[in-house]
Amino acid sequence: MTKLILLLFSMTLFSCGQKGAGETTAPITEVKKASTTTAPSFNADSAYAYVEKQVSFGYRIPNTPAHKACGDYLVSELKRFGAQVYEQEATLKAYDGTPLESRNIIGSFNPDKDKRILLFAHWDTRPYSDHDPDPANHKKPLDGADDGASGVGALLEIARQMGMKAPEVGVDIIFFDAEDYGTPEFAKDRYNDTSDTWCLGSRFWGKNPHKPGYKAEFGILLDMVGAKDAVFYKEYISMKYAARYVDEIWEVARNLGYGKYFINANGGGVTDDHEAVIEETGIPCLDIINHDPNSENGFRDHWHT
């Protein structure tokens, strides 16, 4: 499945992208580096290896050694692929007031190009398994192989390919932090349960982009793209703000023979990083996220378990 996504997204970079259309912070550190339907060939094994590597660090929860080690790895990989890398650190406040030492990681390809595409995923993991059928597991963390690492793994493989063949436009890959620290089910009677307890890193970046006045033609979020037989419906917020790009990408998928994965039907709305970026920057963004229309919450059974 990852290979299908990577093929599609390489098409997005080289084809669709050619059309016009309480917090305390630390300073951003910049690290400078010393129409067709035929997509380049990507390495699915490489993408899965990036997922496995992230999981090997342990739970990527803010304020933990595993989180820092994984962040260092992501920075080093983007630099290795030739990106101009920015690290945006901030102390963000969790639903219960816990200060989260957070780190958004940005890799820019063709940084001098005015025309830009934004690709993003979250790299943190949820500290709670609050949807597990066994209440004894609700306060246990997730390994985040699908929810977090899969989107990052796909983007790392795209970054590797761009390091070998630069796209014709500017591309910014962002790994957002503190997406998955929202109010858990077991604490909703004590704490605020609004959507602003989620997606803290992306909302912070939207208010404080790594380059003042940053703009992109459009943005694409990858979330939970690694499960077996994952299928992607046209998410509601994506269709509201970025319908043109959703339709183009789904058409490319259909032309490449992936129509059984990219379903030409509307799905529900999801509180996710794309919504925060849209609200804070006005950049039209879409969310490619595994959707189960037969599930009460719209997600597969392994979500937050």
Model features per residue range: what roles?
Residues T12-S15:
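C-terminal motif of bacterial Sec signal peptides marking the signal peptidase cleavage site
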Residues G17-S35:
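Short, low-complexity, disordered segments immediately C-terminal to signal peptides
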Residues T29-C70, F81, E296-T305:
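N-terminal capping segment at the start of a domain
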Residues E52, Y59-D112:
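A non-catalytic alpha/beta surface segment that caps or lines the substrate-entry region
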Residues I61-P62, T91-A94, P111-K113, W123-P127, ...:
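Solvent-exposed loop/turn segments at secondary-structure junctions
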Residues E89, P99, F218, V225-T305:
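Active-site-adjacent substrate-binding region
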Residues K139-R244:
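Acidic/histidine-rich catalytic neighborhood of metal-dependent amide-processing enzymes
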